[in-house]
């Protein structure tokens, strides 16, 4: 699946176009902007983060439902019933780094942001690339690797567990 201005496009493993999976619009099951996507191969579902919500679809494009999520930079799945959202510390003063939210939009847990800094008034600090992934799923585990951190973490409902330290 590839998100683009035309929607969420599905391709075969060898690169052949299959279809446009979902529709942009303001109606039920439609998105206004694709901020980020995730997929669950086992459940055969895809998830689109769209300003304050996550829309769920089947691989075939059928609308399943919607969940509310606080504004996040990226997200990934945590098991079958929760999401992990990454809060980018662009002001230097964000209190939280990650937020865990269930499918009903209830906050389950947050993980603090320890990297606090001061920047000139009215400015934001961005150090990222368009294809950077701070959160991702690997073997059905949620993982987090920040741009300026040497540690890859596994995210559990209770804590961040160091998984790898990169030299």
Which residues does each PLM region occupy?
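Asp-box/WD-like beta-propeller blade repeats and closely related beta-sheet repeat scaffolds
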Residues: 31-35, 49-97, 107-123
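Short beta-strand elements that form the blades of beta-propeller/WD-repeat-like
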Residues: 1-4, 9, 44-50, 81-92, ...
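Short loop/turn segments that connect beta-strands within beta-propeller blades
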Residues: 12-16, 58-62, 102-106, 155-159
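Aromatic (tryptophan-biased) beta-strands that constitute blades/sheets of beta-rich domains
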Residues: 1, 18-21, 45-47, 65-66, ...
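Short coil-to-beta transitions that initiate beta-strands within beta-rich domains
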Residues: 26-38, 70-72, 124-137
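Surface-exposed loop and turn segments in beta-propeller and other repeat-based domains
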Residues: 19-31, 106-129, 162-167
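Blade-loop segments of beta-propeller domains
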Residues: 7-11, 16-51
